[in-house]
Design a protein with these regions (language model features):
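Residue patterns forming the tRNA-binding/recognition surfaces of aminoacyl-tRNA synthetases
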Residues: 1-25, 44-46, 51, 104, ...
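Alpha-helical recognition segments enriched in aromatics with Gly/Pro capping
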Residues: 150-162, 268-270, 292-444
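Short cysteine-rich clusters marking metal-coordination/redox-active sites
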Residues: 208, 279, 322-325, 710, ...
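Acidic, turn-prone loop/beta-hairpin segments
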Residues: 330, 476-504, 536-635, 639-657, ...
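Cys/His-coordinated zinc-binding microdomains
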Residues: 267, 283, 326, 714-717, ...
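Short functional micro-motifs and their immediate structural scaffolds
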Residues: 216, 287, 329-331, 715-721, ...
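Protease-associated
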Residues: 38-43, 65-135, 141, 145
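Residues immediately within or flanking Cys/His clusters that coordinate Zn2+
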Residues: 205, 276, 319, 707-710, ...
Length: 733
């Protein structure tokens, strides 16, 4: 103080600020931030301000005088003066220092005959107040933690009902509920001249998350696990676990690295008891291998209810005496284990005790909500590291929470949740499973009637696709009709190439637990690759080609492979639909690779991609064909809209494009792919053009189709006397 030019003979006050005046009697320290600047200032006051009564006989009354000296954080000085209603003109700044310089200076408690040291705390902020924080280790977590670092007593003179005990040593407070204490403490501070100001403000306050009632913090004696003893080993073990998503590793690492000792005791009437005894003669805490083993044997026979049923003497080994004083009067611990400790040892209780069935730890996966990094994932990890020295799991998957379509989090207490059995009753279990697979579970997600209805439509499309496949395989026997890969058309090979891609991407999605990608790939394959492309094109081959022709059997071969793969891919998410499809598959198509008939699709192997189908050259080839198909479709559409043509089979298309090598090589198949009666690759504009359409470097001319409409295939061609084309005549013969 001398260095700052401050007269140490004057009264010096550290100003604190609190929203819980009732905790002032429990104040044990004042916290300041080590790196904040603190200002010492003197307030010059007159008699009128010193006392409200003109005839007051106080020593300082009636004279102009230097006032007391106060210390407040520099960053809050202006706000502080405004709060207490002091004029800056009456303030004389005497000096400044860092909070670090104030460490371990003692202050005198205004209401209790004890000293409160100034300590350093990183939790101190400049958001509000004075920068000097009232610290009561018995009534706040941060206060408790900073107090422990300085060895400050944890003083909490309240009982379990929130009523002051005689430990408060204040007759005005003993037996009074804490919530009535604010008025009493404020009056006491006023009476002793220690209250500078008070005001009403709105601020957040802790409430019970379940019943929504306000709560208070009260420190009580507890049992702890000293995490420091195995923290480094735990952090190392975290790196060996696969975290899904990967961000989970950093999250739990930060929690373990920064966590304090783990409090494992709870004050409840039910739960697993803590097997500790106390000597009633000398107070010795008794917890030994011998006593724990004896209690464990009793619990194994009679369950943990025996702790309530029997006395301490009956639970201890026969003839047991206190190892400290030799007496034999004992009482039991009344606290129970933290339920997180209970769930945290499930790896031992469930897995290790049934190792003949489940194997040994580490287990393959723990799966729970993202809040369990602080809960089950961490408690399981800590118990396993403390006792086994290894993580109890190989991988951990976390998911977000479910919200309604209105964006509100679903909660049992709010009653705004959808019952799964209602969805199952209305739509079936597969729809609920499909919803779970469709969402990116790594984030919070939504569910509601509209979302379920949309998924039901997707489900129907998948089902309709399967019906189409089944309907066109009724006469296909793979043992007799299967067409070799080399005899398939380029279109057929491309369909199998896309099927191979589906197998690879879906398998990878499952391997990485990215089920939403499975949903996206399956939906895209069924809607785009099949319904809108391959199946749309091959209908003509299936319906008009000869029943046993190579063209039809080749197409059926592809449909057979698609169905065999699709039904297996459906199994993990939509097992009921998969089994329903399988029941409709002809018996000759139900054999596995060994030729054995599969009674249920659930017994089949997962599909594997075929190396011979991986013809990547088809990707580039058909990307150009698909582009041309899209352009041709857009060229025909205005004619259909104007009702100049009804079906695309009524037209012929002439396509001009700079890079036409691929289209020219497949020119004979283009009319089938475009679903027109004729298709030509040419740079010459035909006559009688119905529509000319340009897009990028494409030019498409649309004309009336050549010939007459075949009564069987509906294509426009040269017809015979029976009114059908030559291709249909050959098919009939």
């Amino acid at each position: 103080f001398a260095a700052a030019g401050i007269d140490s003979s004057k009264d010096l006050y550290a100003v604190i600020w609190t929203t819980t005046p009732w905790t002032i009697p429990s104040n044990m320290a004042i916290s300041v931030h080590p790196r904040f600047d603190y200002t010492f200032f003197e307030r010059r006051v007159g008699a009128a301000e010193l006392c409200g009564e003109e005839d007051c006989s106080a020593v300082k009354c009636g004279q102009e005088s230097d006032g007391d000296i106060y210390v407040v954080a520099q960053g809050l000085l202006g706000a502080f003066l405004a709060d207490v209603g002091w004029d800056e003109k009456d303030i004389k700044v005497l000096g400044e220092c860092k909070g670090q310089a104030l460490e371990l200076l003692n202050t005198k408690h205004p209401l209790v005959d004890r000293k409160s040291p100034i300590i350093l705390g990183e939790h101190v902020t400049l958001d509000a107040g004075t920068g000097s924080v009232h610290t009561a280790p018995g009534h706040g977590l941060e206060d408790y933690e900073v107090g422990c670092r300085y060895g400050i007593e944890v003083f909490s003179p309240l009982d379990s009902r929130g009523v002051w005990t005689d430990a408060v040593k204040d007759k005005d407070l003993e037996g009074v509920p804490y919530y009535k204490g604010n008025a009493i403490v404020i009056e006491k501070l006023q009476n002793c001249g220690a209250l500078l100001a008070q005001q009403d403000i709105n601020h957040s306050y802790p409430h019970c998350w379940r019943c929504k009632n306000p709560v208070i913090y009260r420190a009580t004696p507890q049992w702890f696990v000293k995490v420091d003893k195995f923290r480094d080993e735990t952090l190392a073990a975290i790196k060996d676990v696969k975290w899904i998503p990967a961000s989970g590793e950093a999250r739990i690492s930060n929690m373990v690295e920064g966590r304090t000792d783990w409090c494992i005791s709870r004050q409840r009437a039910w739960g697993v008891p803590i097997p500790v005894f106390y000597c009633e003669d000398c107070g010795e805490v008794i917890v030994t291998d011998e006593t724990i083993e004896n209690v464990a044997k009793i619990f194994e026979k009679e369950s943990s209810d025996a702790w309530v049923k029997y006395s301490a003497q009956e639970l201890l080994p026969a003839g047991f005496k206190c190892p400290k004083c030799g007496k034999n009067h004992f009482k039991k611990e009344n606290d129970i284990m933290d339920v997180w400790f209970d769930s945290g040892i499930s790896w031992r209780a469930v897995v290790e005790k049934r190792s003949d069935v489940l194997g040994h730890t580490p287990v393959e996966m723990y799966l729970e909500g993202s809040d369990q990094h602080r809960g089950w994932f961490q408690s399981s990890l800590l118990t396993a590291m403390a006792t086994e020295g290894k993580a109890p799991y190989k991988s951990v998957l976390t998911h977000g929470f479910v919200f309604g379509e209105d964006g509100r989090k679903m909660s049992k207490s709010l009653g705004n949740y959808i019952r799964p059995d209602e969805i199952i009753k209305t739509y079936g279990a597969d729809i609920l499973r499909l919803w779970a697979a469709s969402v990116d579970y790594r984030n919070d997600t939504k569910i509601g009637n509209n979302i379920i209805k949309q998924l039901a439509e997707i489900f129907k499309k998948t089902r309709n696709t399967s019906r189409f496949l089944l309907g066109n395989l009724f006469d296909f026997n793979p043992a007799e009709d299967y067409v070799r890969y080399e005899d398939l058309t380029e279109l057929d090979k491309f369909a199998l190439y896309k099927l191979n891609q589906l197998i690879d991407t879906v398998t990878e999605a499952f391997d990485n637990y990215e089920f939403y990608k499975y949903f996206q790939q399956l939906q895209n394959f069924a809607a785009v690759d099949l319904s809108s492309f391959y199946l749309d094109i091959v209908k003509d081959r299936l319906y008009t080609a000869g029943k046993k022709s190579l063209s039809r059997r080749a197409c059926q071969t592809v449909l057979y492979e698609i169905l065999q793969t699709l039904v297996r891919i459906l199994v993990p998410v939509m097992p009921h639909q998969a089994e329903d499809i399988w029941m409709s598959v002809p018996e000759c198509q139900k054999c596995d690779k060994s030729g054995n008939s599969l009674e249920s699709i659930l017994l089949s192997d997962w599909p594997k991609a075929r190396p011979e189908w991986n013809n990547s050259a088809l990707e580039d080839e058909f990307s150009k064909i698909l582009k041309a198909r899209e352009v041709v479709t857009r060229a025909i559409e205005p004619l259909r809209a104007d009702k100049k043509v009804g079906s695309s089979l009524e037209v012929a298309v002439y396509v001009s494009v700079n890079d036409n090598a691929v289209l020219k090589a497949n020119e004979k198949e283009l009319s089938n792919i475009f679903i027109t009666s004729q298709a030509y690759i040419t740079d010459e504009k035909p006559s009688d053009v119905l529509n000319e359409y340009k897009e990028d470097d494409y030019t498409v001319w649309v004309t009336k189709a050549e010939g007459e409409k075949c009564a069987r295939c509906w294509k426009y061609r040269k017809l015979n006397s029976d009114g059908i084309c030559q291709e249909c005549l050959d098919a009939i013969k």
